[in-house]
Regions:
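Residue-level recognition of tetratricopeptide repeat
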Residues: 53-55, 159, 193, 200, ...
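Structural register within alpha-helical repeat arrays
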Residues: 26, 62, 69, 119, ...
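TPR alpha-solenoid repeat register
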Residues: 56-58, 155-156, 162, 196, ...
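Start-of-domain marker
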Residues: 20-74
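Short coil/linker segments at helix-helix boundaries
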Residues: 65-133, 151-157, 191-192, 198, ...
Length: 415
């Protein structure tokens, strides 16, 4: 009698275990037949039952099913599109399931790349959507998840894109340490695919600026040198390194690199713009005559442009400011009065020249269409402010009034 009771108990236990195993099998079958609702119901039971929740297979199919729900939710052409609203949290659940499967799968018997790819792409797309609406913190959360997931999916290209977005989010959040965290590994890469190079131009420039702001001379040079090594075909790399050498006092090396950039771009369609960048290097080294010659050559090649006009205006304004600083350091002796008068005349001459170039720059932006004006709004604002300062310094108050009104209008629109 006892043997019969024991046999019955074991039989009952076996049926219970098999019933739970059948939940996984049922989920697999329903998934193959396209019944996502039934597959989800079956796998959810298996994921919480004691007998199947520690089985890697359970979590593999959970990840797969939730990925299919994601396919229905994100692809209007999906054969599962009628299930698009089946579970709005499909992405998080698919990710958690895949990670649980990875944890339990001691033999790497399950290929999770599809699940990770689907989840990673979803996080990435969400991060772009949030970034474009200005929600940088939530965009960062999603792009960070995307990078981690996509590294598991075997998609390094989209993982790099996600890391780039993470760094850009930190930049918009003014979190320099966050930028360094994400952009640092990108800077250290030795090979960059062509379609990612425009991103890397931004990465190198931003990292250079952060290190310069932090007065980290070693990393300023290292970042610029890495740029020239990894992307030697990009003249911007030589110009960035030239700027680094100016900053560290090596003016001869800076000029050498500026000349190299000029030679590399001489026969390119954008040569006039490159000349302005080269002129900026000469200006920083104190060779104002060569800088002016480069700006004017650029204007001759392309008369209707912003860069040469704003570049010349900025250089002249800086030279006027230097004269002003020298005036402020003088005393009240007769000799100082003579020097002050001479310096004031030189300052005013620079300001009057700057005014003409600033007017041309403003005229250029004003002639653009709405999109062009929006893109150059910051340039316009800076030109207007500089022009207004020129007028005030020269006591040209009537000329200042309409310029100040435009500045106020721009500032009001930004608030």
């Amino acid at each position: 009698m006892k043997k019969i009771a024991l046999f019955t108990a074991l039989l009952t236990l076996g049926i219970a275990v098999n019933a739970q195993t059948l939940n996984v099998q049922s989920a697999m079958t329903d998934l193959k037949r396209g019944y996502l609702n039934k597959a989800k119901a079956a796998i959810d039971k298996a994921c919480t039952h004691e007998d199947t929740k520690e089985d890697a297979k359970t979590w593999y199919y959970a990840g797969l099913i939730y990925s299919m729900i994601g396919d229905a939710a994100t692809d209007p052409n999906s054969k599962y599109k009628k299930y698009k609203d089946l579970d709005p949290d499909w992405c998080e659940k698919a990710y958690n399931a895949a990670m649980r499967c990875k944890e339990l799968d001691k033999t790497d018997g399950y290929d999770l790349k599809y699940i990770f790819s689907k989840v990673g792409s979803s996080y990435y797309n969400k991060s772009i959507e949030l970034f474009n609406t200005g929600n940088y913190q939530d965009a960062l959360t999603n792009s960070d998840k995307a990078a981690k997931v996509l590294n598991n999916s075997g998609d390094p290209d989209l993982a790099n894109e996600s890391i780039y977005i993470s760094g850009y989010c930190c930049q918009m959040l003014k979190d320099n340490e966050g930028v360094k965290k994400y952009y640092g590994p990108l800077v250290r890469k030795n090979k960059i695919k062509d379609d990612f190079k425009p991103r890397m131009q931004h990465v190198y420039t931003v990292m250079y600026g952060i290190y310069k702001e932090q007065k980290d001379t070693a990393n300023v040079i290292k970042t610029a040198e890495r740029y020239t090594k990894v992307m030697p075909e990009d003249p911007s790399a030589n110009l960035l390194l030239a700027n680094a050498y100016v900053w560290t006092g090596n003016k001869s090396k800076a000029v050498e690199l500026a000349q190299k950039a000029e030679d590399e771009t001489r026969n390119t369609p954008g040569y006039a713009k490159w000349l302005c960048a080269v002129a900026g290097i000469y200006e920083q080294t104190g060779d104002f005559a060569t800088a002016e010659a480069k700006f004017k050559e650029s204007s001759t090649l392309e008369p209707n442009q912003l860069e040469a006009n704003s570049g010349m205006a900025t250089m002249l304004f800086k030279r006027a400011y230097e004269k002003d600083q020298a005036i402020s350091n003088l005393g009240y002796s007769e000799e100082d009065e003579v020097i002050s008068k001479k310096l004031t005349e030189e300052r005013n001459a620079f300001l009057n020249q700057a005014i003409d170039y600033l007017k041309n720059a403003i005229k250029y932006v004003d002639a653009l269409d709405a999109n062009g004006q929006a893109q150059h709004r910051a340039d316009l604002y800076n030109c207007l402010r500089t022009l207004n300062t020129c007028y005030i310094t020269l006591e040209m108050y009537d000329e200042s009034k309409p310029i100040k009104a435009r500045i106020d209008q721009i500032e009001a629109g930004a608030n």
